[in-house]
């Protein structure tokens, strides 16, 4: 994690992030718990894929590790994107140049809190649109994450294309996108229980200019 973090929940900040493509906002654990507690039965015997989440620091990954046995998950996969030798979770660390992922099966003595020595590196950057990430997507049953804000429409389109079940937490303004609203109208996707209410905000690295 960055040495310091700040909370951002202002729409102006999110619009700036979309424009500048600095849109990796990290969802707080409390907000994840608040929403996902309504869907616990859907994770039983499922392979869960968090395809926009650093397995070392992601709160989505942490939530599923904490609740792995209770939810009776079959397998958890968490993968993240690394751009231009830049680790999004540590603004001073430029040693990592490839995306990476981690798989957890809930076996006895299996590592559940991976370090940089435990992760598996992609050949590429780990973008959710890459073949490597899509290969992981194909083997998964349900996707849970907070996708990149500037790529929200493309992200949703991919999940629909591969006929994946998903639960994503993001900016409520996304429902105004034509592509997203059409899916809601056709009853192919639904709004969450909280629908943007009661969300504490997002954690962003201190070095981001918001």
Positions of PLM-derived features:
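Class I S-adenosyl-L-methionine-dependent methyltransferase catalytic core
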Residues: 1-210
């Amino acid at each position: 994690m960055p040495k310091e973090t700040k909370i951002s929940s202002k729409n102006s900040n999110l619009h700036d992030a979309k424009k500048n493509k600095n849109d990796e906002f990290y969802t707080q654990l409390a907000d994840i718990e608040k929403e996902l507690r309504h869907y616990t039965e859907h994770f039983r015997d499922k392979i869960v894929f968090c395809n926009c989440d650093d397995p070392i620091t992601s709160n989505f990954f942490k939530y599923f590790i904490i609740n792995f046995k209770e939810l009776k998950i079959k397998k958890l996969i968490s993968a993240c994107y690394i751009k231009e030798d830049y680790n999004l979770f540590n603004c001073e660390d430029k040693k990592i140049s490839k995306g990476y992922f981690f798989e957890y099966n809930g076996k006895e003595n299996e590592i559940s809190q991976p370090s940089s020595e435990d992760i598996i590196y992609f050949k590429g950057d780990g973008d959710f649109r890459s073949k490597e990430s899509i290969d992981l997507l194909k083997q998964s049953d349900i996707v849970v994450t907070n996708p990149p804000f500037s790529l929200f429409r493309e992200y949703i389109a991919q999940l629909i294309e591969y006929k994946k079940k998903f639960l994503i937490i993001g900016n409520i303004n996304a429902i105004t996108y034509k592509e997203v609203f059409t899916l809601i109208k056709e009853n192919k996707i639904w709004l969450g229980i909280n629908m943007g209410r009661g969300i504490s905000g997002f954690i962003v690295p201190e070095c981001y200019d918001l």
